[in-house]
Amino acid sequence: MENHGGPTSTAKGLLAIAEDVDSDWFGVNLDTGNFHSDDVYAELAAVAPHAINVQVKVVVSGPDKVKHPTDFARLAAILNAVNYRGYIVLEYEEAGDPRTESHAYLEKLRAAFA
């Protein structure tokens, strides 16, 4: 299940569902750009133990929808703290040329997880 609107738009709502599913085959596709609270990183940390895949967007935003660069080092610390061992996917949805911009962000992401 992905944190993508509706009842999954907050960590509390997503966890209410995720923790009710009693199956080793169920997990969260954690999208770093889909929480829009006052503390996006706290929400990511709350859900991280349930993550089986992580889609890293290059920006995060709060309730005001103002975009801020994703703090890759902070994200890496959150995922390392829960011993995350799944895939990490870079998802670039910004205005620049993805072929050019994605490479630079991928290098930053690799450095954060090194």
List where the protein language model places each region.
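Histidine-acidic metal/acid-base catalytic patches
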Residues: 7-114
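Short, well-ordered beta-to-alpha junction loops that form the rim of enzyme active sites
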Residues: 2-4
